[in-house]
Amino acid sequence: MNAVLVEAIRSKRRLSFVYNEKPRIAEPQCYGIGHKGTELLRIHQLRGGSEPEPLFNVSKIDSLKMLDEHFDKPGPNYKRNDSAMKFIFAQL
């Protein structure tokens, strides 16, 4: 379990990280274990990709930083208890 991801979700703080060699800025929505046992992160993406609320394999995230920027609400398509995850560490 990644404590930075849990804290970022609980405190509604934005993240910066690199994924597939692209820098990203995101609002974390849900973090847990997928049905195949992979740690997954659902985000609302602000910069760095074309999908607004993609799902990321946490093991492929590099240079993870919690920013001193807060957000107020989930992304427009967010649904609690993400069906892609069998166990959830933290969610909005």
Report the location of each language-model feature.
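Core beta-strand-centered patch of the WYL/Sm-like small regulatory domain
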Residues: 1-92
